[in-house]
Structures are given as C-alpha cells and as structure tokens.
Amino acid sequence: MEQKQEKFSTIGYIAAALGMCIGTGNVWRFPRVCAANGGGAFIIAWTIAMLVFAVPLLSTEMAFGKKTRLGCIGTFRDAGGKKYTWMGFFVAAVCFFLMSYYCVLQGYCMKYAVNSVTSAFKPNLSTETTSAMWTAFTDSQAQVILFHAIGFALACFIVYQGIAGGIEKFCKVAIPALFIILVGLAIYAVTLNGASQGLQYLFTVKKEYILSPNTWIQAFIQAAWSTGAGWGFIITYANYVGEEEDVPTSCLIMGLGLSLIHISEPTRLALIS
C-alpha cells in the first residue's frame, strides 16, 4: 500500500519557510548594507525589490514545486525539459555549499547561546574582552568542531522527526520566539540615549542614494539574500504543501514577515550602536 506523504499545515508551512529565509542575510547583512546605502532610501528600494522580484520568484518556485512534487533537479527537468536539468544540479550544488557555510555559523551561535546561559557575558563588557573571547573560541579547534557537531546533530534530529513532528513543530515555536526577541530588543533600543538620532539616521530618505544605481543593485541583491529566492529551497518545501494552499498569499505573508524582521533588526543595531 502506498504510504501517504506528510503535508505542512498552512501555518506550519509559512513558519518553516520563514525559518528557511531568516538567517545571516537578514540579521547580519541587512543592517550593514542598509546603513551603507542611505538608510531610508535603501529600505524603499529593498521593499520594491521584494515586491517585483523576490515574492514573484518565490511564488514561481512554490508553484513549480507544488505541481511537480519533485526535488530541485527533477523540477527543472520536468518544467524546462532535459536540457535544463543541469540548472537543477547547479542549484542543488549551491545549496550544499551554503549548508556547509551555515553549519559553521550554527556552531558559533550554539557557543554564544551557551555563553549567554552560563553568564559568560556580563554587563558592560569591553570590546577587548569580547574580542579575546571570540579569539579564544575560534583558536580552539576542539571547541569549534564540538559546537559545529552539536548544531548539526540537532538539525538532523529535527529533520529525522519528519514534517509535522519535526520541522513544523519546531518552527511553530522557534519563529514566534524569534519575532518576540527581535521586537523586544528593538523596543529596548528605543529607550536608550540617542534613540531619536539613530531613528533619523536609519529612516531619512536621502535623494543622492535613492537616485544611485548602486543602491538599487544592492537592494535587489539583498532581496535575494533575504528570501532565498532562486536557491531552490521553496521548490523542495512546496512538495509538502496541500493542493488547497494559495501560492501568492503564502509568499506575500512570508514577505511581510521578513519585512518585520528587517525593520526591527536594523532599528535595534542603529540605536544600540
């Protein structure tokens, strides 16, 4: 008898997709690129890039994945013909190398999580102290490998539990928790001295930046980093959505969720720094 394939619920799919999208491109890269490209001008350009590039591409990927019920390679083969199968292999290879990169960063995050719980981070630490802590960690090959292995093992365990019992269950808890943490940090940042200057710097639209081609190029690049559009992740996730799932609505909700992340994170960094 054919085994019934697991499916995401609507909320579970959106949470899992946001979990896929939200990463270093959102939390680390966006604030830096935003500050370097005019603050408010960049946010306008990025918002337009999300609407005309990222969300439509995500919708296309989701539609193809939902239609073919195949992985990245099979989807490119069936959608474009055998001569385009190599594109699927290329996208899959890119994802593999991205995984290698993110696994290392995941280990770093695991180490810092342990430091936070064990009170290694004390109030008013100097830059020299935090730099020394970072150097001591990265110079210790045993620690780097250990935390990398722990993070990778946890990820494998969650995936092994399946769609409903693993990925969806975890993301339904982790994604709301992430939003609460980031919004809480943004609210805290607003209470600090100099908050008004930080907000003005972040959200003032400067004409020279809004008219600069580089601002728009960086905005479209950031839209790809922000969402994973074109990386094949959504093609795979769409294998596990129900036939009744509304593709444009799901992708639009993802875009709105990412927008909240992007606005709260640079706000926090601009005010705290």
Q: Which residue stretches match the model-derived regions?
A:
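Membrane-interface "cap" regions at the ends of multi-pass membrane proteins
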Residues: 1-28, 57-62, 66-78, 85-89, ...
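Inter-helical loop and helix-membrane interface segments of multi-pass membrane transporters/permeases
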Residues: 4, 32-37, 73-89, 104-160, ...
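Extracellular loop-to-transmembrane helix junctions
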Residues: 5, 34-60, 143-144
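Transmembrane helix-boundary motif of multi-pass solute transporters/channels
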Residues: 12-48, 232-241, 249-252, 256-259
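Hydrophobic core segments of alpha-helical transmembrane domains in multi-pass membrane transport
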Residues: 46-53, 94-101, 108-114, 147-160, ...
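Hydrophobic, small-residue-rich membrane helices and short re-entrant helix-turn-helix hairpins
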Residues: 158-176, 198, 211-216, 229-261
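Helix-loop-helix hairpins and the membrane-proximal interhelical loops
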Residues: 171-227
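Single conserved hydrophobic/aromatic residue that forms the stacking wall/gate
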Residues: 261-273
